Amino acid sequence: MQAKTGVNAKPAAAAAMSVFERYLTVWVFLCIVVGIVLGQLFPPVFQAIGQMEVAKVNLPVGLLIWVMVIPMLVKVDFGALGEVRKHIKGIGVTLFVNWLVKPFSMALLAWLFIRHWFAPLLPPDQIDSYIAGLILLAAAPCTAMVFVWSRLTGGDPLFTLSQVALNDSIMVVAFAPLVGFLLGISAITVPWDTLLTSVVLYIVIPVILAQFLRKALLARGPAVFEATMARIGPWSIAALLITLVLLFAFQGEAILKQPLVIGLLAVPILIQVFFNSALAYWLNRAVGEKHSVACPSALIGASNFFELAVAAAISLFGFNSGAALATVVGVLIEVPVMLLVVYIVNNSKGWYERGASAPVA
């Protein structure tokens, strides 16, 4: 059975990734350079953009986020929730890691590294903001790129689709209280009105619009759906890159003064990626799930819905905040780190199947 999203059941090589996806780290580095240069050359322009707000929501960023996330959410078939029961153990592992381990482990790592061990190397007035950004990054499971990672490992397409649909359904109601709770226990003031507004603007409304668009496109046939997705898919990356240019135009001066900050913020993110992916992979093996289920389960546990994290950080704390910078570090390292995780799970298949009690794929 083929999933409607076009997720291919066959194992794939690097061709499964578009040029934009494959070289995302390069594009992010270019955005850093372009943003810093433009911010230094035309500060009044970016100050004007930063002031284009209504109810603490920056209008240009709001538009860019919609362009960024709606094409991704169109791929999500919430009808796949009916497939959850077919791999209930794998789904259980996914939910456990994504909602009970990942956000809390990131909060702990941020507290250890940012508030304590790295604190002497960081600007004191931004430490809370950095921690908030890391929490936002870990609080939303990956939506779009997990389809790519799953294809690269020969993951079960229906399981991948069902876990994304379930995670996105949970995210609609759980993102705000989870972020609010973790920020609260981290002694960071929670702007609840802005947080709830962000959830409505960047999760609820895009999900509704995306599903209406999905239904309309599928009514015209699968070929129309696939052709439209191929056309609008690059919009997401373009909107992300423009957002990053804006962000680094505001952050440029701080980065030039303390370039080490990006490397320090990457440390807890890297630890979290490898810890959560390894935990999910091992748990799936322990409960006897197939390798084709364990791979996407481990990968969604390792990656983040960084587009939402960037949007929420800007709305809650502003362009100039350490929170916004912390979420962008997640974007910067996403592709190379996830490709390494893909390599590990692909090359450990023999070890996995020797220990799994369920029949292998």
What kind of region is each of these model predictions?
Residues M1-K75, G79-A302, F306-A361:
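Alpha-helical transmembrane segments of multi-pass small-molecule/ion transporters
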